[in-house]
Curated annotation (Swiss-Prot):
Belongs to the TRAFAC class translation factor GTPase superfamily. Classic translation factor GTPase family. IF-2 subfamily. GO terms for molecular function: GTP binding; GTPase activity; translation initiation factor activity. It comes from Desulfosudis oleivorans (strain DSM 6200 / JCM 39069 / Hxd3) (Desulfococcus oleovorans). Residues 66-77, 172-183, 229-239 have a biased composition (Basic residues). Residues 529-531 are annotated as: G5. Residues 58-248 are annotated as: Disordered. One of the essential components for the initiation of protein synthesis. Protects formylmethionyl-tRNA from spontaneous hydrolysis and promotes its binding to the 30S ribosomal subunits. Also involved in the hydrolysis of GTP during the formation of the 70S ribosomal complex. The keyword Transport does not apply. Disulfide bonds: none annotated. Residues 384-553 form the tr-type G domain. Residues 87-106, 207-223 have a biased composition (Low complexity). Residues 493-496 are annotated as: G4. It comes from the Bacteria. The gene is infB. This is Translation initiation factor IF-2.
């Protein structure tokens, strides 16, 4: 059902918001403010109530002449139909020939002060005798804006209160009394000044006529009474009494024209100023309290807040004009624990703003619009591209050697330890077309690298050694490929080696869902030998056949998009990123966004180091020009202008800062005890520096696995690049050790480390790094002890020896009793004492140990309360070294 707000309904009814709210309150309709909504049935009810003609009995207006130039007008309650006829002669003026034109002074609210009111004067025929002179009351002419017309109050004045007022005859006393209740005099010139139409006849303007009633000629009614419909302002101010008096007319230069002065008494003045100028003080008259101060609300067009992707709590509160504590309270109600300077996202800000009746708009284009992510691709622009193939498998199964044969290169010879510890991208020209290869590490520490390779590829070549079979990292590679939905081609390597069994590989692969085609499955198996260069062409044919089945296409004429394979910080060139272009063409000089960084491409190189001006789809390149070291796996987008790139980068950086703050641990009542226990843990602080960003991630992830309940690894800092002085300073401040992987510190840095007593360790092979850290953590852990019972002896007789105490003559029941070992005294199965065996004798000779079946004398250090029948149990604690 459609709804309408109160301020819209008031506008359609030509009413003010307070008037309509009062009207709704009288009708029993609950409404909090003018921004509240009403249902259609309630709106129709309100419209009928406003426009319905209200017929009320006419009120008698009693006019009495106080003196020759003052007329007092009072409203009297209607008692019966016979009373107007009885009191009609009282309204006639006894002396009409001395009447001058007075000005009717009434309390006018602020809304009516500027209303354009024109009085339509009637000129009746002058009576022949003074007794026939009557006061004719003319109705007020209609005005254009009915909402601004406010007549005086309709409440009748009690005769007891009116009597003292009639006794006042002095104009000066009357003025003084009026000034006592007013804050200032308001002088107003009427638009149409009144004139004396005839001698003895006075025209009095009656403001009691409703604003929406048409002007009608004044009829000579008894006592000057006429019909009147109370307006909305009358009902609002019912219960308040204001005396309306006319003061002495002030003549001006023109003859017959009189100037009117208006006295605004205290009650009217209070209503007009909404309580701001209420009369106070010891001698001030008591004035009834007015309406409460209305809280102003901005217009609908001003109740909009324009923000970007996020905004701080303080800034949001400032733009809405509310207290920040109120915004924080609303966020807490939504389950968001935010501080004053914490950033909230667009959706959270919109929900909070709605609580304060504000609307949130995005100040700039969204990231999807700036990067053109939702643009539909025209199928006619797609062209065939080269397949991207990732080589995966267990460590030392021959992945890089196989790639060397395909590329006719010698990558393996330059690798430390003969293992791949980076992810590489290469483009190879074969007889059947181009193929892009991604070489991933096989060590268990490089899980994240293998996952990125599986997501960025079209086909996976799973290398399995024929003599080794399926290994843990092989299974992990299978899972990564399945998660990415990438087809797998199995290359059974080392078939020339002794003990090779390709059928064993097929059986084990079938157990993991890779069923060979010759066994009725859909997985291609190729037997190869990288060392003997056997089966290489067959493997490439299978890969290209699989690529044709996938129908790989891309649009080279659009803005480039790609993914970061690897990133590093080069000392001479700055941040360098290895990027695989997925679609579009990337050119030197273009502005790109990559993760939280952006920049203009200064140079590009292929996998062999040759410079490039452009790079099309399925092309691996090294690019220089980013503002920082990108994170492996970040997407790269070419942007039309630098301003858009900067906007996207700043928004992403702000999101990352917000996430980093959210990840920081905070103390609460729930986790206070846990935090206190963590302080007792032994923490090993580490700073990791490596040649590429992927190695930093791999090392950090591998070391975090060693954290346990007693020892914990805290990575203080991790970044690609060489070890510099700031790393040593940070390590000294945080009591950390510096681990370098494929990087070396300079002599100056080594001297600073020696001065600051900072331990710097450099490694080329990740095995050695992980083993050293594991040993260090093991040494930090406390050993545990396990109790082992040696033997038990029963006490049968007691001997008291001076200077040595009580000696228990005992019989060894089982095991053996050794001197100096811990022992416990058991009495009726309950431990009576824990101590150490101080003396052990057999036949008056000291003995080191006594075996079972023999008698001996046992003395317990510092304990003599031994009784016959007790059992002495001898044991020792075995130390168990901790393991990770």
């Amino acid at each position: 059902m459609a709804k309408i707000r109160i301020f819209e309904l008031a506008r359609s009814l030509n009413m003010t918001n307070p008037d309509l709210l009062d009207r709704l309150k009288e009708m029993g309709i609950e409404a909090k403010s003018h921004l509240s909504s009403l249902e259609d049935d309630i709106v129709e009810k309100v419209r009928q109530g406003v426009f319905r003609t209200e017929v009320e009995k006419p009120e008698k207006v009693e006019q009495k002449r106080v003196r020759s130039n003052v007329i007092r007008k009072r409203r009297q309650p209607v008692k019966s139909e016979a009373e107007p006829e009885a009191e009609a002669p009282a309204a006639q003026a006894p002396e009409a020939e001395e009447v001058t034109a007075p000005t009717a002074e009434e309390a006018v609210p602020e809304e009516a002060a500027d209303a354009d009111v024109s009085a339509k004067a009637e000129t009746p025929t002058a009576p022949e005798t003074p007794e026939e002179a009557e006061i004719s009351v003319s109705e007020e002419a209609p005005v254009e804006e009915a909402a601004d017309q406010v007549p005086p109050t309709d409440e009748a004045v009690d005769p007891a209160e009116a009597a003292p007022a009639e006794e006042e005859s002095s104009p000066s006393r009357k003025k003084a009394k009026a000034k006592k209740h007013q804050a200032a005099k308001i002088i107003k010139f009427p638009d149409a000044p009144q004139r004396l139409s005839n001698k003895g006849v006075l025209e009095v303007v009656d403001d009691t006529a409703p604003a929406d009633s048409p002007a009608a000629p004044a009829a000579a009614t008894p006592a000057g009474e006429k019909d009147k419909k109370p307006s909305r302002k009358d009902r609002k101010k019912r219960g308040k009494t204001e005396s309306v008096e006319t003061e002495e007319a002030v003549p001006v230069k023109k003859k017959g024209v009189f100037k009117r002065k208006e006295i605004v008494e205290g009650v009217a003045l209070y209503d007009r100023t909404r309580g701001r100028m209420r009369k106070k003080g010891k001698g001030g008259a008591k004035v009834p309290g007015g309406a409460k101060t209305q809280i102003t609300t901005p217009k609908a067009i001003k109740r909009k807040v324009r923000i970007n992707e996020s905004i701080s709590v303080a800034e949001l509160a400032k733009r809405m004009g509310v207290k920040a504590s109120e915004v924080i309270a609303r966020l807490m109600g939504m389950g968001v624990m935010a501080t004053l300077n914490q950033q909230v996202d667009f959706d959270s800000a919109a929900l909070v703003a709605a609580e304060f009746e504000y609307e949130v708009e995005k100040a700039s284009a969204t990231e999807e619009e700036l990067l053109e992510l939702n643009v539909e691709e025209d199928q006619g622009n797609l062209k065939k591209r080269a397949p991207v193939v990732t080589i995966m498998g267990h460590v030392d199964h021959g992945k890089t050697s196989l790639l060397d044969v395909i590329r006719q290169s010698r990558i393996t010879e330059g690798e430390a330890g003969g293992i791949t510890q980076h992810i590489g991208a290469y483009k190879v020209n074969t007889a059947n077309g181009e193929v892009v290869f991604l070489d991933t590490p096989g060590h268990e520490a490089f899980t994240a690298m293998r996952a990125r390779g599986a997501r960025a590829t079209d086909i996976v070549i799973l290398v399995v050694a024929a003599d080794d079979g399926i290994m843990p990292q092989t299974i992990e590679a299978i899972n990564h490929s399945r998660a990415a939905g990438v087809p797998i081609v199995v290359a059974v390597n080392k078939i020339d080696k002794e003990g090779a069994d390709p059928d064993r590989v097929k059986r084990e692969a079938s157990d993991h869902g890779l069923v060979p085609e010759d066994w009725g499955g859909d997985t291609m198996f190729v037997n190869v030998s990288a060392k003997q260069k056997l089966g290489i062409s067959d493997l490439l044919d299978m890969v290209l056949l699989q690529a044709e089945m996938l129908e790989l296409k891309a649009n080279p004429d659009k803005k480039a998009r790609g993914v970061v394979i690897e990133a590093k910080l080069d000392p001479g060139r700055g941040p360098v990123a290895t990027v695989l272009i997925h679609e579009g063409t990337l050119s030197v000089g273009e502005t790109v966004v990559c993760g939280i960084h952006y920049g203009k491409i200064r140079a590009m190189f292929d996998d062999k180091g040759a410079p490039l001006d452009q790079a099309g789809p399925a092309t691996p390149v090294e690019l220089i020009g980013l503002g920082g070291v990108a994170t492996s796996g970040d997407d790269l987008f070419a942007v039309g202008d630098e301003k858009s790139a900067k906007t996207v980068s700043e928004n992403r950086q702000q999101k990352q800062r917000t996430e980093d703050l959210a990840r920081k641990d905070s103390i609460s009542l729930e986790n206070f005890f846990e935090k206190m226990q963590e302080k007792e843990e032994k923490v090993l602080n580490i700073i990791i520096k490596a040649d590429v960003n992927g190695s930093c991630e791999a090392i950090a992830d591998s070391l975090q696995k060693f954290s346990s309940g007693e020892v914990k690894i805290h990575v203080v800092h991790s970044a690609p690049g060489t070890i510099i002085e700031s790393d040593v300073t940070l390590a000294s401040a945080s009591n950390a050790i510096v681990l370098g992987f494929n990087v070396r510190p300079s002599p100056k840095v080594r001297a600073l480390a020696a001065e600051e007593n900072v331990d710097i360790r450099s490694y080329d092979i990740i095995y050695d790094l992980i083993d050293d850290i594991k040993k260090a953590l093991t040494g930090m852990m406390s050993s545990t002890f396990e109790e082992e019972v040696l033997g038990r002896a029963e006490v049968r007789e007691l001997f008291v020896i001076p200077k040595k105490g009580t000696i228990a003559g005992s019989y060894v029941l089982d095991g053996k009793i050794e001197r100096g070992r811990p022992a416990r005294l058991l009495r009726d199965g309950v431990i009576a004492y824990n101590g150490v065996i101080g003396s052990l004798r057999r036949h008056k000779d000291d003995a080191k140990e006594v075996a079972s079946g023999y008698e001996c004398g046992i003395g317990i250090e510092n304990y003599n309360d031994i009784k016959p029948g007790d059992v002495i149990e001898c044991y020792f604690l075995r130390e168990i070294k901790p393991e990770l």
